[in-house]
């Protein structure tokens, strides 16, 4: 969001924006809230919780006096939380810590085995988000996740049918209107359009060498490629996907494009592309793997040990 407006607001500036717009978008590091961490470590000790992960998140929520909080826990290969079981345990820890801090917490365990939307990198993500808000782009998984999480928060605040309400707010243009109001209050250009957001001039597009379906995406590799291209420090750098898991892929179709602001960084990213398994393309996976119709002949004597 730093592409659209200043987000390194001080506490007084944040209060001013909230009082004016009933919302804000800030970088927590600019508020100097970390000293509260010590108190949370003492609270967490009897819960046997990681003394770093939870306080780093919850301390800042308590410091700004949040009373309702929705936490997104992306889950799956390529994420910090690999299984739904682990995600549920983490969610319970967050909720218990929230109870002790008088913050009502709910968690959304979300699918994390591919990027949300098609963009990785500050300008690319801002371009995509603004396009969706304006109704100019169709990004189903981004809309689905955003309205799911917004819907949970709406229901926590007493509204009914939260997801449907969130979708209506998005489709009606009210979400875009509020975003532009916040952009203006925080010193950005409220008239900004997606095409006004500069992207890196240096690009490289990876194309498929065969036809099939996109079966998997290596999130960690994509993030590393975006980082080598210059993101997030270089706002115009990053990766834009052209295909998502399950999409049909034909030979020579574009799979993703790397953006960089400097050619030397693009070259580094391209080297990593060549070294990595970024995407998996093949035939659509079937549920039946293999039929076993006859008792297999053992290769050695079967012995039951007690």
Task: State each model region's role.
Residues 2-64:
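Phosphate/pyrophosphate-binding betaalpha-module
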Residues 48-53, 60-306:
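Well-ordered secondary-structure scaffolds
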């Amino acid at each position: 969001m730093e592409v659209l407006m200043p987000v390194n607001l001080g506490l007084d500036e944040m209060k001013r924006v909230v009082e004016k717009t009933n919302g804000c978008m800030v970088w927590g590091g600019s508020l100097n809230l970390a000293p509260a961490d010590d108190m949370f470590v003492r609270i967490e000790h009897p819960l046997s919780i990681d003394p770093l992960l939870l306080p780093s998140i919850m301390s800042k929520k308590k410091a700004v006096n949040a009373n309702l909080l929705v936490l997104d826990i992306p889950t799956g290969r390529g994420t910090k939380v690999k299984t739904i079981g682990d995600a549920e345990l983490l969610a319970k820890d967050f909720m218990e810590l929230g109870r002790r801090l008088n913050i009502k917490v709910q968690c959304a365990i979300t699918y994390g085995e591919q990027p949300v939307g098609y963009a990785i990198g500050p300008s690319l993500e801002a371009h995509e988000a603004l396009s969706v808000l304006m109704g100019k782009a169709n990004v189903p998984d981004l809309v689905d996740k955003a309205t799911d999480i917004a819907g949970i928060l709406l229901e926590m605040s007493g509204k009914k049918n939260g997801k449907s309400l969130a979708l209506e707010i998005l489709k009606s243009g009210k979400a875009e209107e509020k975003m532009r109001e916040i952009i203006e209050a925080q010193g950005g250009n409220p008239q900004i359009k997606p095409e006004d957001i500069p992207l890196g001039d240096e690009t490289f597009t990876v194309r498929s060498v065969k036809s099939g379906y996109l079966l998997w995406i290596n999130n960690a590799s994509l993030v590393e490629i975006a980082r080598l291209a210059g993101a997030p420090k270089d706002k115009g750098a990053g990766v834009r996907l052209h295909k998502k898991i399950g999409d049909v892929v034909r030979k020579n179709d574009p799979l993703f494009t790397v953006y960089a602001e400097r050619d030397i960084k693009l070259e580094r990213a391209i080297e990593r592309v060549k070294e990595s398994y970024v995407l998996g393309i093949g035939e659509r996976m079937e549920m039946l793997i293999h039929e076993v119709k006859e008792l297999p002949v053992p290769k050695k004597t079967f012995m039951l040990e007690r």
